[in-house]
Amino acid sequence: MDQKEVIGETGHKSVDLIKIMDKWQKKWTEAKIFEAEHDSRDKFFITAAFPYLNGVLHAGHLRTFTIPETIARYQRMKNKNVLWTFGFHVTGTPILGLANQIKERKEDIIWAYNNLHNIPMDELLKLNTPEAIVECFSKKATEAFKRMGFSLDWRRNFKTDDKVFSKFIEWQFYKLKEMGHITKGSHPVRYCPKCENPVEDHDLLHGEESTTVEYSLIKFTSKFDGKEIIMPMATLRPETVFGVTNAWVNPNEIYVMAEVHDEIQKLDSEDVDLKYNGIWIIGKECADKLKEQDRKIEILKEIKGSELLGLKIKNPVTKKEVPLLPADFVEMGIGTGCVMSVPAHAPYDYVALRDLGKVEEVGLIPLIEIEGYDKYPAKEIVEKLGIKDQNDEELLEQATSKIYKDEFHKGKLNENCGEYTGISVKDIKEKLTKDYINSNIAEIMYEFSEQKVVCRCGEKCIIKTVKGQWFINYSDENWKKLAHECIDNMNFAPEGIRQEFHNKVDWMKDKACARKRGLGTILPFDENWIIESLSDSTIYMAYYTIARFINEGLTPEQLIPELFDYVYLGNGNAEEIAKNSKIQAETIEEMRKEFLYYYPLDWRCSAKDLIPNHLTFMIFNHVALFGREHWPRGIEINGYVTIEGKKLSKSKGPVLPVSEVAENFGADVARFYITTCAELPQDADVKFKEMEKARDNLIKLYDLAVSVMEEESAEKELSLIDKWLLHKTYSSINSAETAYEEFQLRKIGLMFYELINDLRWYKRRGGENNSVLKEVVEIWTKLLSPVTPHLCEEIWEKLGYAGFISQEMYPVSKPELINEDLELGEEFIKSAMEDIRNIKGVAKINPEKMYLYTADDWKYDLLEFMNENAEKNVKALIPMVMKEDKFKRHGKEVMKLINEIMKIGVKKAIAEVEILENAKTFIESEFDCKVIVNGEDVKGKKKFAIPYKPAIYME
């Protein structure tokens, strides 16, 4: 096979990637080379958030899991003792719900799992119990991991419904309760009425990222139908009550008059007392919601919205009466169906009043002073943007967003706000809400941040105040301080997400940690409850460290709390625990050593959807249960995955099962593409044409390896182009190391594609040193092996090496072969040739003779001067340059040259004449003409030459 053909435009399709994949996976399994135990080497412990087994592993899993897999392989090459393993998440209600849906033969579910998850119909219809689903998808997940060539220690694998794992979770919850972190009480939670359970993100079909939003209900009052009534107005900005000029109701909707009682929970009991809270007029949907939020609602009558128009209601803060006016934009699914109007500051309100011709009648009341705005910000921005009416929704959204942002960051309450005058908008909400509640002019109502929040069972979720519920008190300020301390000392990839974790900790509230149904561990101190799935998955990384011992045959009964106290906290005596647990003391000591060796966790890897829940909970639980020396050290976050621009969906598609990708493209192609197609925080869009290109380029490396082994590798004196290729290759060792260390895996892909281009250039420049090519292939096979291990194992074997490349050390760079001048020289030649092509194209000539002129010496001196002062901008640089006599005499030409050099980039000066002379034969062959370097100055062209840009004349 001719190497020149191999590194040309197309690679051979002579290699069977699937066959290679099968071969090396079998060899790895037989050799057990990825099983890890404590020894004298430095350790490296990396994990990813384990998958939930209600479907096959898909492209999103592939990206999230291949990143730590790649880093694990790299760290082994750095002689680290790497622990990299996986468990499976099965607890909670989704699997239970799926089993019921299959049992009921739900058409959409049957279609999805048959067509998207590729489950044969006869097998699918048997998945009508949680146990069958767990067995099916745990096997498929295991097979998918193995088909992708993941270098896992399978001895540590577990499922979260394992009885032995439940003993670990029981220990965790006993500890949290002892510390006062678990309490019982009433709290608003996301709730499924059909399942009769609080629901978490994993339980949802829609609205996984929804949060619970706290609205203030401002209690306006009036008389209606002969009764004193309250008309509560829901708002996220209670300070705006000072600027209310009217209120909006929807004339086309149904409202209710209802008698409201507050439910007051009795001490140490789930029973309640009722406290009368007046007669309210609210939307019908609002009444249904408030029934679930510590209120008893008795409907007295229904009222059409149109019947309320013109009613005067009293502002409880300003004591002014304002009218109810009609507005079709009032959404009954949010708040109470009655909305405060603040037209001085809300563009929607101002435009709606203007459309009704009511602006002058009700007036405008300013309440916030904002730098850069006049007295009435909404009026000003509406007129500035030319908003015609309420149909200009896009402009209204733009106006509203800008004003609210500016008010929050720069606004202060004005003299219309009484005792609150001068307080900034960003600081007022909490104080004002507290004052209003204490004065009985406001209450709290909870809504979702998204309107569509649906349980996996298909039921629409609500916010319910659950009584007698167990909570983890993540709102504890002292606990939050420890979490912040942990975050401050962690590594993050990308670094920019650190602040997001701080924000999540600040916003964290108490969280329901148990439910009445589903799979999982029974709450050890209240057997009526089951620990929910985001609470039993916060410290299981510690379980990995001892799972191999447990999986050798320990029983749940042997895993007594004292065992975990000793292993994880160092409390107690191994001999005493051995007597009580019937576990050998030596095994207990080994478990303790293994934990101390591998902990803390070096890196936790996940997609960004787990930041507000699992990952933040992980930090909280670690700082509560473990000493600082065992707090997690790093978190890596990647973006989502789409398929040809379409969002992944387990129920609607696309899914792209991992096993399908492995069989169609080969594991290495999938691994290479998914880790290198996007920067870490960006979403990755899988495009099959690009995967095919990746496959072709990987095959080129294989074919090159075969070709260099077929040809003689006689020692030759190194040419300049040989030295250039070696420089590029040995420079790549350092660059790749940095990329791996910083999780910048896209750079590995870009470097590989650059290698392919470099090999083409090497061939084009006459490179033919087989020894050099073999050296390049050996190094790059190592550099790529963490990403494409099967192909690299095969190449390593073809190169004549015994053993696994998976156990080789990372290549060592050779500083003596790194010479930046070589790289700058070749880039200079490429640039000059591009300029020649452009001139030929514009002039439309085929020259017989071509003159290349390099710059005058003073121009190189200027380049060096700029290089020495590279931190200076042009404005600062010019006075410094003009102080030098050798530059000053060239006057305006200097100014122009500085700008031109800045455009091409300030680089060190190189021997351009020598470089062009050495490349002259090559350039002549490329353009089929005679090349003269710095010959006679034909038509005065030489003066146009600048460093890195030779002047060109053709004839």
Curated annotation (Swiss-Prot):
Motif 'HIGH' region: residue span? 51-61
GO CC terms, sorted: cytoplasm
What superkingdom does the record give? Archaea
What Gene3D superfamilies does the annotation carry? Class I aminoacyl-tRNA synthetases (RS), HUPs, Isoleucyl-tRNA Synthetase, Domain 1, leucyl-tRNA synthetase, Valyl/Leucyl/Isoleucyl-tRNA synthetase, editing domain
Q: Give one GO term, molecular function aspect.
A: ATP binding
Binding, ATP: K650
Tell me the CDD domains matching this sequence. Answer: Anticodon_Ia_Leu_AEc
BP terms from Gene Ontology: leucyl-tRNA aminoacylation
Report the EC code(s) recorded for this entry.
6.1.1.4
The places in or outside the cell where this protein is found are: Cytoplasm
Give the principal location in a single coarse category. cytoplasm
Give the enzyme's main class according to its UniProt record, as a single word. Answer: ligase
Keywords assigned by UniProt, alphabetized: Aminoacyl-tRNA synthetase, ATP-binding, Cytoplasm, Ligase, Nucleotide-binding, Protein biosynthesis
User: Mind telling me which PANTHER family this protein's record contains?
Assistant: LEUCINE--TRNA LIGASE, CYTOPLASMIC, LEUCYL-TRNA SYNTHETASE
Q: Which HAMAP family match?
A: Leu_tRNA_synth_A
| Record protein name field | Leucine--tRNA ligase
Phylogenetic classification of the source organism: Archaea, Methanobacteriati, Methanobacteriota, Methanomada group, Methanococci
